[in-house]
A protein has these predicted regions:
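Binuclear metal-dependent phosphoesterase catalytic core
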Residues: 58-149
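His/acidic metal-ligating clusters that form di-metal
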Residues: 1-68, 128, 132-143
Length: 149
């Protein structure tokens, strides 16, 4: 509340919503969510929330605020949203999120940590130097120049 005009992020361990993974939800902070929603309603400068606990990427909203749940850096909680689902983990790839504030927008990227190849596609494009300059200047890309040939 000390800086109501400054965009603010909230980081917390447990997500402020039910995920559908009952056995993880039962370990969360489901009590008091109405009070948290009231606080967020008074603080419109909160532009995003990030949580963990679930070991899997989830996107939702709570009280009108976008919420991301960070992916796993070790094992992932198995995505099984049936009421009788047994608690399980899986060996999905490890990942992390990078949150980037750009002008007036929160941008969140997910980066997989396992080794993977990258490929330079500039050799497949006509007039790469011209395209590069247009992109750097944030100019619209004519459709004929926007495709890979």
């Amino acid at each position: 509340g000390a800086a109501p005009d400054k965009p603010t992020l909230i980081f917390m361990h447990h997500p402020p919503f039910e995920t559908g993974i009952w056995w993880m939800d039962s370990l969360g902070i489901l009590d008091g969510l109405d009070r948290l929603a009231t606080v967020l309603g008074r603080h419109r400068q909160v532009v995003g929330m990030t949580a963990g606990h679930l070991h899997r990427t989830i996107h939702a909203t709570f009280a009108g605020v976008p919420v991301t749940v960070a992916p796993t850096t070790c094992y992932a909680v198995d995505l099984d949203i049936h009421d009788e689902a047994l608690p399980k983990v899986t060996d999905e790839p490890s990942a992390m999120m990078l949150h980037y504030w750009h002008v007036d927008t929160l941008v969140s990227h997910t980066l997989f940590l396992d080794a993977h190849e990258t490929y330079d596609v500039t050799g497949l494009m006509k007039d790469w130097p011209g395209r590069f300059e247009r992109m750097r200047q944030r100019q619209p890309m004519p459709k004929a120049l926007g495709s890979i040939e």
